[in-house]
């Protein structure tokens, strides 16, 4: 996956394009190559280095059977992220982060259990409900599914959270920091590298940039998953 062509591929996927110099975080200076036409250009050599680091970490997590939650409120990548999570058997949240998702885990778990009840036992009782009760039931199920469908199989707080769009996810970051949940982030030039454990300096606004990174992450997650499957078979 990592070869001589990767920087060229990153360039065409627009990973190098940062924000205008009027909108940046000085803490990202180390990862900037230059300024061009008023925009900061991300150093792709460093992007390769940190992407390798993240991919190796993710592969290790997969081998150990650890679970990752992917979080992004970027509407343009919702379908891709859902598909990605299904393929890698991960969890996802694509709506605005609900305060207390982690810090009030008992309430979150209650909502997940209720959604799963509607999906299984609720269907059995559906025919016995009145028209009004069915309407109320559908509304409640729809509301729960909006926020919890991507984590309905999550039995506990995940081992790692992968954030896409750090500037939109302050609540999620705050809860991860409070509970010492490790995070991985794609960091654009307006982001803060001190607010995450692992990161990839890259354009986090471009769909092509995000998809490029997710494809690498998927490859290493599945690679790690195959190793754990073999280990389970031979043990």
From Swiss-Prot:
<dbReference type="InterPro" id="IPR018130">
    <property type="entry name" value="Ribosomal_uS2_CS"/>
</dbReference>
<dbReference type="Pfam" id="PF00318">
    <property type="entry name" value="Ribosomal_S2"/>
</dbReference>
<dbReference type="InterPro" id="IPR001865">
    <property type="entry name" value="Ribosomal_uS2"/>
</dbReference>
<protein>
    <recommendedName>
        <fullName>Small ribosomal subunit protein uS2c</fullName>
    </recommendedName>
</protein>
<dbReference type="GO" id="GO:0009536">
    <property type="term" value="C:plastid"/>
</dbReference>
<keyword id="KW-0934">Plastid</keyword>
<dbReference type="GO" id="GO:0005763">
    <property type="term" value="C:mitochondrial small ribosomal subunit"/>
</dbReference>
<dbReference type="GO" id="GO:0006412">
    <property type="term" value="P:translation"/>
</dbReference>
<keyword id="KW-0689">Ribosomal protein</keyword>
<dbReference type="GO" id="GO:0003735">
    <property type="term" value="F:structural constituent of ribosome"/>
</dbReference>
<dbReference type="InterPro" id="IPR005706">
    <property type="entry name" value="Ribosomal_uS2_bac/mit/plastid"/>
</dbReference>
<keyword id="KW-0687">Ribonucleoprotein</keyword>
<comment type="similarity">
    <text>Belongs to the universal ribosomal protein uS2 family.</text>
</comment>
<dbReference type="InterPro" id="IPR023591">
    <property type="entry name" value="Ribosomal_uS2_flav_dom_sf"/>
</dbReference>
């Amino acid at each position: 996956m990592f070869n001589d062509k990767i920087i060229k591929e990153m360039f065409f996927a627009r990973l190098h394009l940062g924000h205008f110099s009027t909108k940046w975080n000085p803490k990202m200076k180390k990862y900037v190559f230059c300024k061009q036409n008023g925009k900061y250009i991300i150093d792709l050599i460093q992007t390769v280095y940190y992407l390798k680091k993240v991919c190796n970490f993710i592969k290790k997590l997969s081998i150990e059977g650890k679970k990752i939650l992917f979080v992004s409120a970027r509407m343009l990548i919702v379908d891709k992220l859902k598909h990605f999570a299904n393929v890698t058997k991960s969890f996802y949240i694509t709506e605005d982060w609900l305060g207390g998702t982690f810090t009030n885990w008992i309430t979150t778990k209650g909502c997940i259990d209720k959604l799963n009840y509607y999906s299984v036992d609720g269907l059995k009782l559906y025919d016995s409900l009145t028209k009004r009760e069915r309407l109320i039931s559908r509304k409640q199920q729809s509301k729960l599914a909006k926020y919890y469908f991507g984590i309905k199989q999550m039995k506990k707080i995940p081992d790692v959270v992968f954030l896409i769009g750090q500037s939109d996810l302050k609540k999620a970051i705050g809860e991860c920091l409070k509970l010492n949940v490790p995070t991985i982030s794609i960091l654009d030039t307006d982001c803060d590298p001190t607010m995450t454990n692992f990161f990839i300096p890259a354009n986090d606004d471009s769909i092509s940039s995000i998809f490029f990174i997710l494809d690498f992450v998927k490859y290493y997650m599945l690679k790690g998953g195959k190793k754990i499957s073999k280990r389970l078979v031979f043990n």
